[in-house]
Amino acid sequence: MNNLQKQFPHISIKLNEPLSKYTYTKTGGNADIFVMPKSIEETQEIVSYCYQNTIPLTVLGNGSNLIIKDGGIRGVIVHLDLLQTIERKNTQIIAMSGAKLIDTAKFALGESLSGLEFACGIPGSIGGALHMNAGAYGGEISDVLEAATVLTPYGELKKLKRSELKAAYRFSTIAEKNYIVLDATFSLELEDKNIIQAKMDELTAARESKQPLEYPSCGSVFKRPPGHFAGKLIQDSGLQGHIIGGAQVSLKHAGFIVNIGNATATDYMNLIAHVQQTVREKFDVELETEVKIIGED
């Protein structure tokens, strides 16, 4: 820790930082070393230093589709929340990794650019969205993603073109190669602002009516199994409302697990395992987690 602070006195570095402050579930242990770079250059410095000194490094985005275990995370956490610039270039939008997806969709609306309406309610960061090819209501990030600037795990800066950014359902080249997203370029289309707003209002209303936004949660917990819907399988298994500790299968949407009061990451993990086992026994279907789970028990 002292070496890191001496090496980078210009960068915000905290010791034993509670990660529950940075996750939507309000759960998770502490980070040994918590770093918040203010620029691409600072991010590259930290990543290169950790690689050269064999220090474990984990990147944290908006913490919205994430469970951090109660034992926390060893090594260095790099939180990219300060990299939030969003700008327009012709009919393209360039957003930095820490920018919120919702804010980027609103920025596009303000510029009369269509294509990100589906993202108007997704509570993730640009970096996290690219990592998992986030999507909702028939749209995915890969539909509009033109290019991305990334860091390799050893700190090399790379520009990836659309053809290099292979993506599938909740999968991307970025995740496969463990790249760190620095910014993303989206190709959009000019459209009447009122038409864009109407579509966003429609999707927001649908989201509010179906999802348990009144409780802390990690968003959609499970991927959609082929030929099924995870929420329907969970509901038909009689698990809607099931509670372990402070974690509950949402009464509003069975595909969500909410924190109804002082839940721990262990509560979440135990409830996820119980749901998977029950659905497997009843329907012979494997539920694969969409939520990313990291850290130590």
Swiss-Prot record:
What GO cellular component entries does it have?
cytosol
> Which coenzyme or cofactor does it need?
FAD
Keywords, A to Z, come to: Cell cycle, Cell division, Cell shape, Cell wall biogenesis/degradation, Cytoplasm, FAD, Flavoprotein, NADP, Oxidoreductase, Peptidoglycan synthesis
Q: Which GO terms describe its molecular function?
A: FAD binding; UDP-N-acetylmuramate dehydrogenase activity
Task: Answer whether the UniProt record assigns the keyword Cytoplasm to this protein.
Answer: yes
Top EC class of this enzyme? oxidoreductase
Where does the record place it?
A: Cytoplasm
Report the protein name in the record. Answer: UDP-N-acetylenolpyruvoylglucosamine reductase
What does the record give as the organism's lineage? Bacteria, Bacillati, Bacillota, Bacilli, Bacillales
